[in-house]
Amino acid sequence: MEHNGSASNAGKIHQNRLSSVTEDEDQDAALTIVTVLDRVASVVDSVQASQKRIEERHREMGNAIKSVQIDLLKLSQSHSNTGYVVNKLFEKTRKVSAHIKDVKARVEKQQVRVTKVETKQEEIMKKNKFRVVIFQEDIPCPASLSVVKDRSLPENQEEAEEVFDPPIELSSDEEYYVEESRSARLRKSGKEHIDHIKKAFSRENMQKTRQTLDKKVSGIRTRIVTPERRERLRQSGERLRQSGERLRQSGERFKKSISSAAPSKEAFKIRSLRKAKDPKAEGQEVDRGMGVDIISGSLALGPIHEFHSDEFSETEKEVTKGGYSPQEGGDPPTPEPLKVTFKPQVRVEDDESLLLELKQSS
């Protein structure tokens, strides 16, 4: 029993030792994990800081690139401007060179003229015979002229050139004043007058004059005829126009009625054939044709309003009385055609009433 108790105590002690060892190991593992995590966090922080620095550097580089691009654009613009200016300078230099050539040609011509003048002056000086006439504005010109003869020449030719040959400036900027002649003045004045006339009769001036005239005429119209009177005149004109249209329409209706009541061409043809066959039946055919034409005209004009019963009764009686008697030859008798005539009667109540009569030709 004692042995068992000691064994159990030893087991408990061993278990306690093992549990203490496992607890120490767990604590050490936790510490190592914490230290590792701290190191990882520090590494991550350093990485994030480096990434932020890299991003800032990238931004700085992008800004620098943009500034460089802007500078390049400015340089290109300035280069294009300088090229344009250089082209203008080249053109100006070409013009200046051409002008210089012209000036050189003029100077050469002047030199030729100067040499001619010098030769003439030398000839005159050799002859020593020339006249000098001086005109002044206020003082009248003398009648007699002074003539210099046998003038003593100076000893040196250089002194003579200085006295009689003043220095001539041959600069290209020198301007010469030439007096205009009377014809040139007249031409200028004529051109100025023509220009003034053209300006006076130009389109703009003519339009302005038209506008002013229209305004004046409108003012005069308003003074002469007031707007109320003008409106009344317009209304009266419209009324007259409407009455004229009504009259025209009534005339057209009257023409249509007359044309519809006129005898047709077929009636005339039948009448002419019957006249050729039987000249005695001329009167009957005339009445018959008139009746047929009036029937057609009455249909065009309008419906018949009233029929007289007495006339219808008389016609019926005549038709019943008149029988068809057989002829000797045994042939059936040919019935005579009915004669239809219309007699227009004008009444107070109905203006367009027509009277129908049916008569049998005997």
Curated annotation (Swiss-Prot):
Record keyword Cytoplasm present: yes
Chain positions with Phosphothreonine modification: 334
Localization of this protein: Cytoplasm, Myofibril, Sarcomere; Cytoplasm; Cytoplasm, Cytosol; Membrane, Caveola
Molecular function GO labels: GTPase activator activity
Sites bearing Phosphoserine, chain numbering: 152, 171-172, 353
Top-level taxon of origin: Eukaryota
Main location: cytoplasm
Keywords, alphabetical: Activator, Cell membrane, Coiled coil, Cytoplasm, Developmental protein, Differentiation, Membrane, Myogenesis, Phosphoprotein, Transcription, Transcription regulation
Region entry Disordered, spans: 1-24, 230-289, 305-346
One GO cellular component, as annotated: caveola
Induction: Up-regulated in response to cardiac hypertrophy.
Record-stated family: Belongs to the CAVIN family.
Complex and partners: Component of the CAVIN complex composed of CAVIN1, CAVIN2, CAVIN3 and CAVIN4. Interacts with CAVIN1. Interacts with CAVIN2; this augments the transactivation of NPPA. Interacts with CAV3, ADRA1A, ADRA1B, MAPK1 and MAPK3.
Function recorded in the entry: Modulates the morphology of formed caveolae in cardiomyocytes, but is not required for caveolar formation. Facilitates the recruitment of MAPK1/3 to caveolae within cardiomyocytes and regulates alpha-1 adrenergic receptor-induced hypertrophic responses in cardiomyocytes through MAPK1/3 activation. Contributes to proper membrane localization and stabilization of caveolin-3 (CAV3) in cardiomyocytes. Induces RHOA activation and activates NPPA transcription and myofibrillar organization through the Rho/ROCK signaling pathway.
Record's protein name: Caveolae-associated protein 4
Gene behind this protein: Cavin4
